[in-house]
């Protein structure tokens, strides 16, 4: 029976490159001189911390980071923004969590979307991914088209892998 998997993964090499490019740009741009602006990727690749000496500099550094991520084809749907918080007398930071895998509640939404569309496919939740099976290839391609159409509404980064006939 034909099937494919829906996953949400970030290319960690591209993520590291984007963070390094952001660091380089922050160190060379004139408007960031003396602001102690920095972008740090957590050692376990689960979060990015943006630091500076004021909220508007954190926002500006975050915009630079988002631009670099978008240029490297990393979906911005895979980011969860934390609150901007003070870390000392003159420092501010924001933690951006990286979403790897599809959360269970989003998987349930995707399965419900398949059932509501009345397509002849079934979705099964497997840990942090979703497997979609159907009787023929055309149904699976229609399911992929449906997921791509609803991707903005669901605010979920999705890739389709392991397409088997």
From Swiss-Prot:
Zinc: present as a keyword of the record? Answer: no
**Domain of life from the UniProt record:** Bacteria
Name the keywords, alphabetized.
Nucleotide-binding
Q: Does the keyword Nucleotide-binding apply?
A: yes
**For this UniProt entry, what's an example GO CC term?**
cytosol
In terms of InterPro entries, this protein maps to: DUF520, UPF0234-like_C, UPF0234_N, YajQ-like_sf
Cited function? Nucleotide-binding protein.
The molecule here is called Nucleotide-binding protein MXAN_1478
């Amino acid at each position: 029976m034909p099937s494919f998997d829906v996953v949400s993964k970030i290319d960690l090499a591209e993520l590291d490159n984007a963070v390094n490019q952001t660091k380089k740009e922050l160190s060379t741009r004139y408007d960031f001189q003396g602001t102690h602006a920095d972008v740090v990727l957590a050692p376990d690749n689960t979060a990015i911390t943006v630091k500076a000496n004021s909220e508007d500099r954190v926002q500006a550094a975050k915009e630079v980071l988002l631009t670099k991520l978008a240029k490297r084809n990393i979906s911005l749907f895979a980011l969860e923004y934390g609150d901007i918080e003070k870390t000392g007398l003159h420092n501010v930071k924001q933690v951006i969590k990286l979403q790897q895998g599809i959360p269970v509640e989003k998987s349930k939404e995707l399965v419900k979307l398949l059932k509501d569309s009345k397509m002849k496919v079934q979705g099964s939740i497997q840990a942090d991914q979703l497997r979609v099976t159907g009787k023929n290839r055309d149904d699976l391609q229609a399911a992929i088209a449906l997921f791509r159409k609803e991707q903005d509404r669901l605010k979920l980064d999705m890739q389709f892998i392991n397409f088997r006939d």
